[in-house]
Regions:
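Conserved residues at the C-terminal ends of beta-strands
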Residues: 52, 186, 277
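Accessory, non-catalytic peripheral segments of nucleic-acid enzymes
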Residues: 228-360
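Acidic/glycine-enriched edge-of-secondary-structure segments
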Residues: 18-28, 124-129, 239-253
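Short, charged, solvent-exposed linker or helix-capping segments at domain edges/interfaces
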Residues: 15, 136-139, 232-235
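Alpha-helix termination/capping residues and helix-transition junctions
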Residues: 43, 77, 177, 266-268
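His/Asp/Glu-rich metal-coordinating catalytic cores
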Residues: 48, 57-203, 207-212, 216-218, ...
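N-terminal active-site segment of His-dependent metallophosphoesterases
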Residues: 1-68, 139, 148, 349-360
Length: 360
């Protein structure tokens, strides 16, 4: 059977680094992401969609959000299973309780595991919900078995750890006890690929999309084949935008070109933060640089940690270790071929940094 596993959409959340207008636009894009994902799942003949919690960032939603979710999922041709997480926990009167969900959607509403049989797919799906913002009771793998179905899927929001957690500690040893075929997890915002605990495969799909500079890179979902013989799930990059956070060294370079080279290609839709470092030849105007880079990405945040470039040979010939060091390199520089001079200048900078006990 074909399984699509997603989590942590955090619909109606704030977006870091954006003004109110762009944040509203990106929130609407997040809602549209759900519709696009349903269409993608239909186009790729997904049988089951597993949504492992934190679909909403909180229960304080814009009026259209929960309805948009329900309408989108109604268009999915397969079965949908939702396991509410710590941000969107299930409670009487919550957003999950206030919407008329389509018949193809099953929401797990209890802390204790429940199993739904899918005889037409020779499968079962076992899941549980957060019913409060915290869940200190650790995961009990023995209680999470999917019965005797040839394909036993699980869906859960929580933190894989060998210690304690207020977000439902899930020990790998407990995952092993489930004897599930595949356990779809939510809570961790980075996809780490499929892991194994005994015969049970488990994975975090990561968040979709990223919402801040601590959630950089491609975001998407997992999709693939789950059979009694094995699991083949792959990450599908799907977010329209990425957060990027990079450093651009402007030493002996034009600042705008340094920024362009530091960012990943095709960053026109991305939200980018760039830390400018190195030696600047002249005073740096961030406003002017922003204007020069207008249109490079959807949003650009610049921070200046550069320092004025000094005459590297200014203390050449001084009666000191520094002066003798520079004198020797200057003589080499003057006698060098043009292609060799950049290397000598770099050696001088590294040497001065070492003598002055500072970073470059």
């Amino acid at each position: 059977m074909r399984v699509l596993h997603a989590a942590d959409l955090h619909l109606d959340s704030a977006f870091a680094g954006l003004d109110d207008e762009k944040a509203a636009l990106f929130r609407q894009e997040s809602r549209d992401t759900l519709r696009r994902m349903v269409d993608w799942g239909n186009d790729h003949a997904a049988d089951v969609m597993l949504l492992a919690g934190d679909l909403f960032d909180s229960d304080s939603l814009f009026s259209q959000t929960a309805r948009t979710l329900a309408l989108a999922l109604a268009r999915f041709r397969g079965k949908v299973f939702l396991a509410p997480g710590n941000h969107d926990f299930y409670a009487a009167g919550s957003s999950y309780d206030a919407v008329d969900w389509p018949e193809n959607v099953h929401i797990f509403t209890a802390r204790t595991p429940q199993t739904v049989l899918l005889p037409e797919l020779n499968a079962s799906v076992t899941g549980a919900a957060f019913t409060a913002a915290e869940e200190w009771q650790p995961f009990d793998g023995a209680a999470f078995s999917g019965g005797d179905a040839p394909i036993r899927l699980g869906i859960l929001h929580g933190e894989v750890t060998r210690g304690e957690s207020k977000y439902r500690a899930i020990a790998p040893s407990e995952i092993k006890k489930t004897d599930l075929t595949y356990l779809a997890l939510g809570h961790v915002h980075r996809c780490g690929g499929v892991q194994w605990a005994g015969k049970t495969a488990y994975a975090y799909s990561g968040c979709l999309p990223g919402r801040g500079f601590d959630e950089t890179g491609d975001k998407g979902f997992l999709f693939g084949e789950v059979t009694p013989e094995g699991v083949d799930m792959e990450f599908v990059p799907f977010a329209l935008r990425r957060y990027q956070s990079v450093t651009a060294d402007i030493t002996e370079r034009e600042p705008a070109e340094a920024v362009r080279q530091a960012l990943e290609p095709d960053c026109g839709q991305d939200i980018c933060r760039v830390l400018l470092t190195g030696a600047r030849r002249e005073e740096l105007s961030l406003a002017a640089l922003q204007a020069e880079l207008a249109g490079l990405c959807a949003a650009l945040e610049l921070t200046d940690e550069t320092y004025p470039e000094e005459d590297i040979w200014a203390r050449c010939g001084e009666d000191s270790l520094r002066g003798l060091f520079l004198q020797e390199l200057r003589e080499r520089y003057d006698a060098a071929e043009e292609a060799e001079k950049d290397g000598i200048l770099r050696a001088a900078r590294f040497g001065l940094a070492a003598l002055e006990n500072r970073d470059l």
